[in-house]
A protein has these predicted regions:
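Carbohydrate transferase catalytic cores enriched for Leloir-type hexosyltransferases
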Residues: 1-386
């Protein structure tokens, strides 16, 4: 059921990296990867213990609840695993899934009404159906548990990790190419912004990125210093999003929009930035926080959601609802080389606590608890649904 694995977002990246770790750590188990198309099938043919099964369907619900469980039963699957949050409700095959977010409950206005109805109806059923639950962060689990009854045992937190390109040891040639390709200034503040709903191409813009408030805070910062640094924004369609909400060229003075930036270039941008700022209202995990810390980029992150859980004491925490606090943090961090050096060092050390391998090991431990010997002989089916 890995139909979100080709999404160009954090969820797709999480699914891909977790699956790679399972295949590498557990070579004796046969993994069947259910896909809705063969667009990414070739990526898994290098693994001798992986088999892809493409099931075409225009209906996500039919794919999750009817087609995949029928195929899993036919193929003799012993355990279903979903890196997202759905499971076949009528299947007798035991299932495990990862809770990726509780944003629908915390910020329902960020989603269309039908999405909220689906989540509020189905997610409690999935939580009852699962033999075991994993979660992307403790804060996400606590927020969800305060809103719905979770009856399945929660057996672990499967934090995300970062790829080897996100390191403090930057390649000068790669940095030079990145600077030239995107016309980056000598010094700058970096942010990674999201304005699109993940996995839903036809939905309106996603407002939970808090981009308007961050841009207003940046204007305050510019007004309070004689030498403001440019704000470099990585992310699809951000300039269009802000223009559509009334931001003029004058209001966007000093802002450089890069559009989508691949990981290799993004890592170089982190390494060159004076600091990184993320002002999202709710991070279920906050992969950009970890990426920034791993590259030695001083991080300014929200004090809400998983921000404090991921960053610990290595980052400057902000109230994402307070433009004045965001502006003050930008002034504080950009104005002190000594503070930036301390934050960079602390962030590098903090980032070492997270890895994709650890996530894979935690998931395999759950497999073994549910199906003894699962990590030696059992067929599992990594799954993703929405």
């Amino acid at each position: 059921m890995a139909r979100a694995i080709d999404q160009a977002d954090g969820l797709g990246h999480y699914c891909e990296q977790v699956l790679r770790q399972l295949l590498l750590l557990d070579p004796q188990t046969r993994y069947i990867i259910f896909l809705r198309s063969d667009a990414v099938g070739a990526a898994w043919r290098e693994f001798a213990n992986a088999q892809t099964c493409v099931i075409h369907s225009h209906s996500k619900l039919a794919w999750d609840q009817l087609l995949v469980p029928a195929a899993a039963r036919r193929l003799g699957v012993d355990l279903l695993f979903n890196p997202k949050f759905s499971l076949p409700l009528l299947s007798r095959i035991p299932g495990v899934f990862v809770i990726q977010s509780c944003d629908w409950y915390v910020n329902p206005k960020n989603y269309p009404w039908w999405d909220n109805i689906y989540i509020r109806l189905m997610l409690p059923l999935y939580c009852r159906k699962a033999r075991s639950l994993l979660c992307i962060s403790k804060s996400t689990l606590e927020a969800l548990a305060a809103r719905i009854k979770i009856t399945a045992p929660v057996t672990g937190i499967t934090y995300a990790g970062v790829g080897p390109e996100f390191t403090e040891h930057g390649d000068p040639a790669a940095q030079r190419r990145c600077r030239e390709e995107y016309s980056l200034p000598e010094r700058f503040i970096l942010t990674v912004a999201r304005v699109l709903h993940t996995g839903h191409r036809k939905l309106p813009d996603y407002p939970g990125g808090n981009n308007e408030r961050l841009l207003r805070a940046y204007r305050l910062y510019r007004q309070r210093t004689t030498q403001p640094l440019p704000l470099v924004v990585a992310g699809r369609d951000v300039e269009r999003y802000l223009r559509a909400r009334g931001f003029s060229a004058d209001q966007l003075q000093g802002v450089h929009f890069l559009g989508f930036v691949p990981n290799e270039r993004l890592a170089a941008a982190y390494q060159m930035a004076d600091c990184f700022v993320l002002a999202t209202l709710l991070e279920s995990f906050g992969l950009p926080i970890l990426e920034a810390m791993a590259t030695g980029c001083p991080a300014i992150v929200p004090a809400t959601g998983a921000g404090p859980e991921v960053a610990g004491s290595a980052a400057r925490l902000i109230d994402p609802y307070d433009e004045g606090d965001i502006a003050a943090a930008l002034l504080e961090v950009t104005g002190s080389p000594q503070l930036r050096a301390r934050m960079a060092h602390a962030g590098i050390l903090r980032a070492r606590n997270f890895s994709w391998r650890q996530a894979g090991e935690r998931i395999l431990a759950v497999f073994d608890e549910l199906v003894p010997g699962a990590s030696a002989t059992t067929t599992a089916a990594p799954a993703t649904g929405s």
